[in-house]
Amino acid sequence: MAKFRLSLVQFLVSPVKSENLNRACKLIKEAAQKGAQIVALPECFNSPYGTKYFPEYAEKIPGESTERLSQVAKECGIYLIGGSIPEEDSGKLYNTCAVFGPDGTLLVKHRKIHLFDIDVPGKIRFQESETLSPGDSFSVFETPYCKVGVGICYDIRFAELAQLYSKKGCQLLVYPGAFNMTTGPAHWELLQRARALDNQVYVATASPARDEKASYVAWGHSTIVSPWGEVIAKAGSEETVISADIDLEYLAEIREQIPIRRQRRHDLYSVEEKKN
């Protein structure tokens, strides 16, 4: 199939987990009814984002949140990229994205590889590593349309991850994320366009809607970028669902017009996956 419909759900996360799950499922169903074949949720969609919240809201996988996602994916017959949730496993906490197929099967579980530890004096300091552990594996899943690579938020800053996903044959990269009011306006769109252009792939980012009263205020602006580096769909800060057609023939045309994949000097440099 040369084209498919991708939708990103940007919704206002509340402190009540059950409300978040109900709201997410409602918006997923609305997106599916409008023709979405792949739907993505935001980072930390079932809880407020913050190191003090991760232990309180953490779940096993499978657990309450992922069971709901599995059910709604099956009900709608879609591929569902389940944003991320705080996951507890063997005494450790992870920032984890679970992906489900149209039959409700768990296809892949991506644990955020690069933890969000930054300190911008006078603006923002955040240390995910205070409570979270990093993941150590790559996450690619197959669809009838194309291969899809998954990262979470801060993972997008690392060009190597996108390059490895591209080498694995991914034509769409999806990053549930929650940039803030400092890094959001400066880097959010720039990073997406860079990853799309560097690798000649579609890039999508799903953010929570902005809540000015939250302890961590998300930038919002969920976005879909083409392999030409063009923004083809973009939200504001409010709760919404955005959609775009992912056109794989267009992607192939771009790769033929500017054939950087054939022109790379593999005799001089490479980005390689390290095996454990």
Curated annotation (Swiss-Prot):
Compartments (UniProt record): Cytoplasm
Gene3D superfamilies per the UniProt record, alphabetical: Carbon-nitrogen hydrolase
Occurrences of domain CN hydrolase (ranges): 4-248
GO cellular component: cytoplasm
Active site: E43, K112, C153
Any matching Pfam family: CN_hydrolase
Keyword Hydrolase: yes
UniProt-listed InterPro entries: C-N_Hydrolase, C-N_Hydrolase_sf, Nit1/2_C-N_Hydrolase
Catalytic activity of the protein: 2-oxoglutaramate + H2O = 2-oxoglutarate + NH4(+); 2-oxosuccinamate + H2O = oxaloacetate + NH4(+)
Keyword Cell cycle included in the entry's annotation: no
MF annotations from Gene Ontology: 2-oxoglutaramate amidase activity; omega-amidase activity
Keywords in alphabetical order: Cytoplasm, Hydrolase
PANTHER family membership: NITRILASE-RELATED, OMEGA-AMIDASE NIT2
Family recorded in the similarity comment: Belongs to the carbon-nitrogen hydrolase superfamily. NIT1/NIT2 family.
Protein purpose: Has omega-amidase activity. The role of omega-amidase is to remove potentially toxic intermediates by converting 2-oxoglutaramate and 2-oxosuccinamate to biologically useful 2-oxoglutarate and oxaloacetate, respectively.
Self-association state and partner proteins as the record states: Homodimer.
Name of this protein: Omega-amidase NIT2
Organism: Xenopus tropicalis
